[in-house]
């Protein structure tokens, strides 16, 4: 298998404030977390894991041949859960890169995962994350995050507000990160920062501490399921692609 020095970790927990038992919600006949895992697994990496505190989530994943790492329910963020899971991977001294894929993107494209891995390995960035060019209408919801970058594609700032102000085209941030191992270790050792807490975006902790985030363009905005309305959109999308035989 390719990228033996990379681990993909999908953090997933049952407790969600906006959508009860979110990972176990059905899209068609398959749970959200199973769909995420199956999409990620298509990237073809041996070290692919779901990190969870839930026996129910673990059961869903192991039944389809996936690997699960149990983590403490008190872990505060997905990135911290990713790091705790990484520490429990057997022979993890051979892993130099960790990809954190959020467990709420049921149609995430495997090509996007592979793209950030290649970009991370061939750059000097601490972290790499995908972005998509979109228009104003596509990102006006407060749950969406936009990013401002410099001419080289280095992230300058992330916000739940539309940035830059007055633009008609924006860069939508996809919730997936490729970390160098030492960057992930450093991130979890840092305390939450002012901008991070203000925007409720943990990636700002990286920028406020002088670390670098590179961005790479991907083609499509993946559906993220955070609310009941998001779930309805995901089900509708699934029904549409099923009719097309995709």
From Swiss-Prot:
Its main location: cytoplasm. Its EC number is 2.7.7.38. It is an enzyme of class 2 (transferase). The lineage of its organism: Bacteria, Pseudomonadati, Pseudomonadota, Alphaproteobacteria, Rickettsiales. Pathway: Nucleotide-sugar biosynthesis; CMP-3-deoxy-D-manno-octulosonate biosynthesis; CMP-3-deoxy-D-manno-octulosonate from 3-deoxy-D-manno-octulosonate and CTP: step 1/1; Bacterial outer membrane biogenesis; lipopolysaccharide biosynthesis. Activates KDO (a required 8-carbon sugar) for incorporation into bacterial lipopolysaccharide in Gram-negative bacteria. The gene is kdsB. Pfam families: CTP_transf_3. InterPro entries: Cytidylyl_trans, KdsB, Nucleotide-diphossugar_trans. CDD domains: CMP-KDO-Synthetase. Belongs to the KdsB family. GO terms for cellular component: cytosol. Keywords: Cytoplasm, Lipopolysaccharide biosynthesis, Nucleotidyltransferase, Transferase. SUPFAM superfamilies: Nucleotide-diphospho-sugar transferases. One of its GO terms (biological process) is CMP-keto-3-deoxy-D-manno-octulosonic acid biosynthetic process. It comes from the Bacteria. The keyword DNA damage does not apply. It is found in: Cytoplasm. It catalyses: 3-deoxy-alpha-D-manno-oct-2-ulosonate + CTP = CMP-3-deoxy-beta-D-manno-octulosonate + diphosphate. GO terms for molecular function: 3-deoxy-manno-octulosonate cytidylyltransferase activity. This is 3-deoxy-manno-octulosonate cytidylyltransferase.
